[in-house]
Structures are given as C-alpha cells and as structure tokens.
C-alpha cells in the first residue's frame, strides 16, 4: 500500500501509549480553543486537533467536553518550536506546548546533550521541510486519471498521487488539504488516514550508533508531556 509519506519518520507513534497520545491531543485541543475559539469550522488549528483526536479513538463526547472545559480553564498554554542539528547534520524540529516554558527548555536541553546535538537558528532546519496534506483513500471505482481530473477540476493543488491495488495516496499542498477532504467525502471515498505533515525535502543517512542516539531522543520526547511532536529527516 502506498504509505511512504504517511509512515515517514516524525514521532515514533507505535511506541507511544495511547493514553499518553490522547493526553497530548487533549492538550492540543485546549490550546487551539484558547487561541482561536471553540468554533471548529472557523478555527483551522482546532479542526486539525479534533481530526487527530478522533483518529486516535477519542470519542466525540470527550472532545466536546474538552472544548467546553478549555473555554473556562484559565491555564495559559504557550506554543514553542525548536530546531536542532543532530548527528551527521540530521535536521530535527520539536513542537512544544506547555504551561511552563522553563521546564520545557530545561528538559529539552538535557535530551539534546545526550543526543550530542545543538540548537539551531530559526528556519535553518525548517527550510528543508515542506508542509503537505496527505490522504490515503479507497479507489471507490475511480481510475487514477479520473481522480486526477476530479481534483484538478475542483482546484486542488495535487503534488503527488500513488496507487496500489485498492488505494490511492493523495498528496496536496497544505492550503488544499481541507478542500481535498471535503471533496473526497462528497464523492463517497473511504478515507483510511489523513493528516497535515512536514515532509523532508532532503534526507540524511545515519550509522547504527547515531540511530540509537536519535531513537533515545525520540523516546524521551514522546514521554515528555510538554512535547507534542518531533519531525526529523533521518533515513
């Protein structure tokens, strides 16, 4: 199945407990509500957070309670993005969401030291990534050419389209992501998975020792409540 983008290394989600993941997603929903309000249709960050929460099994009722509770919760949550150069120049981006920025930075500095890495200047790592929207969908009796025609005729900026026996992997630019999903639903496609994701424009090879260091770093980040996601471009 054409999952080369959907399974690209970002966070080691398979190793992360579902409870921990749901806790982080609930925090992400709360931050989105505080920043842009509780109207999902008018708040893109909240829309993405809710999509992810539903995909990870959080019930619609739990999400509604979280949204309503977040409107009344006085806790201030701050978003942070740290860029890092790791072993052999591998680029790493850490997205944090915390009520205690000093705690987050202190913990992250410890993880970076063990990785034998260093903090990078803003955009020195991000420049090597591009945000794209990705959807993995069942064929729904469409040929590849028919799907391409459907997307183009609806002004979807298609970047890539992969196909196997029963599925398409559709890759679009980030501004087209929600329009793509609406179009797929309207045409009765079964969406198996979808997300907005930073895709590396170039990749870096690591040796076994460097991979071990990187995996330890990723595991530490996964266990840290203040860290939401980690993106890297290691093979």
Swiss-Prot record:
Gene3D superfamilies: 1.10.10.200, 3.30.70.980. Its main location: cytoplasm. It is found in: Cytoplasm. GO terms for cellular component: cytosol. One of its GO terms (molecular function) is DNA binding. It comes from the Bacteria. GO terms for biological process: regulation of DNA-templated transcription. Belongs to the TACO1 family. NCBIfam families: PRK12378.1, YebC/PmpR family DNA-binding transcriptional regulator. This is Probable transcriptional regulatory protein MPN_478. It comes from Mycoplasma pneumoniae (strain ATCC 29342 / M129 / Subtype 1).
């Amino acid at each position: 199945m054409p999952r080369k983008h959907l399974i690209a290394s970002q966070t080691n989600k398979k190793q992360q407990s579902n409870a921990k993941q749901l806790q982080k997603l609930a925090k992400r929903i709360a931050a989105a509500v505080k920043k842009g309000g509780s109207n999902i249709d008018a708040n893109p960050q909240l829309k993405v957070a809710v999509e992810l929460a539903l995909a990870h099994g959080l019930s619609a009722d739990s999400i509604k309670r979280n949204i309503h509770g977040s409107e009344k919760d006085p806790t201030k949550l701050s978003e942070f993005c740290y860029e890092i150069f790791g072993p052999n120049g591998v680029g790493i981006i850490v997205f944090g969401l915390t009520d205690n920025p000093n705690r987050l930075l202190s913990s992250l500095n410890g993880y970076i030291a063990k990785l034998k890495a260093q903090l990078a200047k803003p955009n020195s790592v991000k420049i090597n990534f591009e945000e794209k929207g990705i959807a993995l969908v069942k064929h729904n009796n469409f040929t590849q050419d028919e799907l391409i025609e459907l997307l183009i005729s609806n002004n979807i900026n298609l970047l890539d389209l992969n196909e196997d026996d029963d599925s398409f992997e559709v890759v679009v630019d980030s501004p087209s992501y929600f329009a793509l999903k609406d179009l797929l639903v309207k045409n009765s496609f079964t969406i198996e998975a979808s997300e907005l994701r930073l895709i590396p424009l170039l990749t870096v090879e690591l040796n076994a020792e460097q991979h071990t260091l990187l995996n330890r770093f990723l595991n530490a980040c996964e266990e840290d409540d203040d860290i939401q996601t980690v993106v890297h471009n290691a093979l």
